[in-house]
Design a protein with these regions (language model features):
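N-terminal strand-loop element at the rim of the active site
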Residues: 8-66, 166-168
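An amphipathic, basic-hydrophobic alpha-helix
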Residues: 58-86, 96, 100, 104, ...
Length: 207
């Protein structure tokens, strides 16, 4: 059996819809992949990729510190039991508490920042709390992946991470076998369709 990789995430879609190809490649390369996330009716789709899935409750929107402490404890127990060679985390709470748990046990850790969240853009006390937690969770990260340079610069300028920790990716990628390439239409007028939330942090101001 190859090296054990633990992936922690907060939702089925985070892994299956956006990271399915990565997971399949890791399994193909011989990694023993374990995925920790909240169970959903579609969880068998992830298991079919050849990985083991562990049900871990993650309340994405809760501000209850008791729930967050429970999540930290769940990650500590999971890492202690599974003894992974590397932990890869996605999304804010998983990055923070997964990183903290890895620090306690000296397990190599990498984080993927899929977005900074509204707290960073709104500022105030909540932003300061999230920033402080991120500094603790990401302190020993071997690498922190970003999908755009703007998010990376925010955490670097806030001294949440060091320059050498930041790794900017060219997007999450598109499976061209599932979504085939099409030629541009011959129309001279180019029309854009924006599908997303009407929020500044989602790029509305750049349209």
């Amino acid at each position: 059996m190859g090296k054990k990789l633990l992936i922690v995430a907060n939702h089925f879609a985070t892994i299956y819809k956006f990271r399915k190809e990565l997971v399949s490649k890791l399994v193909e390369e011989g990694y023993d992949v374990i995925i920790s996330l909240p169970f959903s009716p579609d969880i068998e789709k992830i298991k079919d990729l050849g990985v083991r899935v562990i049900d871990t409750k993650v309340d994405r929107k809760s501000l209850n510190p008791i729930k967050d402490l429970k999540l930290l404890n769940d990650y500590k127990n999971l890492i202690k039991e599974e003894k992974p060679d590397l932990v890869l985390a996605y999304t804010i709470k998983c990055n923070i508490y997964g990183g903290m748990a890895c620090r306690l046990y000296g397990v190599p850790f990498m984080a993927n920042v899929t977005g900074l969240g509204s707290a960073y853009y709104r500022g105030g006390m909540l932003k300061n709390i999230v920033s402080s937690l991120y500094k603790i969770g990401l302190k020993n990260a071997k690498g922190v992946f970003f999908e755009n340079i703007a998010n990376a610069r925010v955490l670097i300028d806030d001294k949440t991470i060091n320059d050498d920790q930041a790794i900017v990716l060219k997007g999450a990628g598109v499976n061209l076998q599932q979504f085939e390439y099409c030629e541009m239409p011959s129309d001279k007028v180019v029309k854009f369709l924006f599908i997303g939330r009407i929020m500044a942090e989602k790029g509305v101001n750049e349209l």
